[in-house]
Amino acid sequence: MTILYSYCDSPIGPLLLRGDATALTGLYFSMGDKARGAGAGWHRSDADFVRVKRQLAEYFAGQRKQFEVALAPQGTPFQTSVWQALREIPYGETRSYLDIARQIGNPKAVRAVGTANARNPLAILVPCHRVIGSDGSLTGFAGGLASKRALLELESRHSGLWA
């Protein structure tokens, strides 16, 4: 299988997009402590990522609340259950790690939920930025806490929850 990639500019820095002919398999931050770059043997193909780039631009402009892109994250069954729960957090809202653990039917797995959240290969599209500490504090994020805060503020401004 050929791994394709492209970069997408965003207000929180450049994003690395990875996928194949059928689905997006990764969206990573290409700056910061956990920055990712293209792997050896990956093939650059900007044309294959036009749709997701357009949808990301709409998201950052406050015009899109859900993404319509085929996703294929690779992970364990537990990780994929956490990532599915993340996708169910409504735009503009947050949940705690405990909330997610309860949602997947394993309330004692708070730390494991945190680990799965940290290994989310599809940042923004699988909205791990919407997960916060039980006390309401911002916790780790691959793009850095400033980016997490920016994403939450963007969604808060455009969610209509406080209008």
What are these model-derived regions, one by one?
Residues 1-108, 154-163:
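Basic nucleic-acid-binding alpha-helical/helix-turn surface characteristic of O6-alkylguanine DNA
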Residues 134-163:
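…primarily DNA-binding HTH/wHTH and HhH modules…
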